Regions:
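Conserved DEDDh/DEDDy metal-dependent 3′-5′ exonuclease domain
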Residues: 29-155, 161-165
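Short, surface-exposed beta-edge/turn micro-motifs
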Residues: 1, 18-20, 51-52
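Two-metal-ion RNase H-like nuclease active-site motif
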Residues: 2-12
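RNase H-like nuclease fold core
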Residues: 14-33
């Protein structure tokens, strides 16, 4: 299992809406960092072996760019059954994004896949607040979102630091959660799992025989 945090910086022009900078950092090895200046290079970077989880802080936003690229620039087919070389989503009726999953390859019980997840479901706060509340030394910076960034634009040092800190802050907070065995998809699922652990599996089933909870 490889786990990363990621962030897209995008243009604000509705007639030219695209990724102009992205960053990924390995949650378990913060020295592993990757950058690019368009979404094509992001997809080219994606790991192809084993299970990879990639957290975006607000998947509903970044996920729209992922889905657009999958639908328009790749030959991946949508398949809720998770067939080889396909993708599927977990999106609530109200439009809440929980997961986008790409299945790259299958061989017997071995599956190579990528799960795009929403760190906001585990850390429902702004990046600035996360840094403060978790005692993280990096702080959220500022950039000019309205600045013109044409195709081929090269990010400056401040913009690189901005995207790095945004990703690094969430990485460090998630790592603290993972070290406490808070590894579920959402904060509520983490709470449920903790309660089950405190009560015990047998007693939980006796107390709530018809709960039928989805353990995510």
């Amino acid at each position: 299992l490889k786990r990363y945090c990621a962030d897209f910086e995008t243009t604000t022009d509705p007639n030219d809406c695209r990724v102009w900078l992205w960053c990924t950092i390995n949650i378990d090895d913060l020295s592993e960092r990757h950058y690019g200046t368009d979404i094509a290079s992001f997809f080219a970077w994606l790991p192809t072996k084993g299970l990879t989880e990639i957290y975006f802080h607000n998947l509903k936003f970044d996920g729209q760019f992922l889905l657009w690229y999958l639908l328009h620039e790749t030959d991946f087919a949508y398949d809720e059954k998770g067939g080889e070389h396909s993708f599927h989503t977990l999106i609530g009726d109200s439009g809440i994004f929980y997961m986008i999953e790409m299945v790259l390859a299958k061989k017997h019980k071995n599956v190579d896949k990528i799960k795009f997840l929403d760190s906001y479901k585990k850390l429902p706060f702004t990046v600035k607040k996360i840094a403060k509340d978790f005692g993280i030394e990096e702080s959220k910076g500022e950039i000019d979102y309205t600045k013109k960034r044409p195709l081929g634009y090269e990010p400056d040092a401040n913009e690189m630091e901005y995207v790095t800190n945004d990703v690094l802050i969430v990485c460090k907070a998630l790592r603290q959660q993972f070290e406490q065995d808070l590894t579920k998809m959402t904060i509520s699922s983490d709470g449920l799992n903790f309660a089950k652990g405190q009560i015990g599996k047998k007693r939980w089933q006796a107390l709530f025989p018809g709960a039928g909870c989805i353990d995510r």
